[in-house]
Amino acid sequence: MILKNTIKNASLLLKNSFIKSHLLDAEIIISNIMNVKREFLLLNDDMMISKSIINKYNDAIKRRLKKEPVAYIVGKKEFWSIDFPVDKAALIPRPETELLVHEVTEFYKNKKINILDIGTGCGCILLA
């Protein structure tokens, strides 16, 4: 099957299940399975993909249709340009937290402070 058609079909399934980020999710999942960046998908959209990739992709899309977060499906979440491994045992980093870290670092830019991270997630705040 052709890559762009595979993504389009999966995106439509997700859209019909009221998943707002349907195209983004479809692209993130297939790029993770193929171990390529999302830009690769745009540059190679007429590429034929193997049956094994399609099977893995279909399984992952079924998980997303059940509203499982993309981060759990792909096993990672980006935070401050760093990929952090995530699973159901850790909270997924949220964009709001990224903004909070940015604002705190800007506010205390020239001040010495102590911060305690009590480990409720994947460690992204501490490491970022």
Language-model segments: what does each one mean?
Residues I7, A26-E27, Y57, V70, ...:
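A general structural signal for well-ordered alpha-helical segments in protein cores
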Residues L14, L24, L41, L91, ...:
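Generic leucine side-chain signal with a strong bias for well-ordered alpha-helical environments
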Residues E96-A128:
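Conserved SAM/SAH cofactor-binding pocket of Class I
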Residues I7, R38, K112-N114:
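Secondary-structure boundary/capping motif
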Residues M1-M34, L41-L42, D46:
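Non-catalytic accessory regions of SAM-dependent methyltransferases
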Residues N32-F107:
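Conserved AdoMet
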